[in-house]
Regions:
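The alpha-helix within a helix-turn-helix
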Residues: 14, 25, 55
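Short alpha-helical DNA-recognition segment
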Residues: 18-38
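A short, Lys/Arg-rich alpha-helix, primarily the initiator
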Residues: 1-16
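Gly/Pro-rich interdomain helix-loop hinge
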Residues: 43-44
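DNA major-groove recognition helix of helix-turn-helix/homeodomain DNA-binding modules
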Residues: 29, 49-64
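Residues within the helices of the helix-turn-helix
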Residues: 11, 22, 52
Length: 67
């Protein structure tokens, strides 16, 4: 999966949950700037720990982030 595709999936899931970027960042315990870069496709390959925290904060399985 490319960074841009992952970023689109992440942003789509976040907006579907009516969650702001800062809210998700706080729930997942990641810096808002890092989350913004992930969504923009500027950062790639988040760690498994970050993926798990994002998935938990969004209420989805990790695999859904990677589809």
């Amino acid at each position: 999966m490319t960074g841009k595709r992952f970023g689109r999936v992440l942003k789509t899931l976040r907006t579907a949950k009516a969650m702001g970027l800062r809210e998700l960042a706080k729930k997942a315990k990641v810096p808002p700037g890092y989350l913004a870069e992930l969504e923009a496709g500027k950062k790639r390959n988040p760690s498994l720990d970050v993926l798990k925290r994002l998935a938990k904060a969004l209420g989805v399985p990790v695999t859904e982030l990677l589809e």
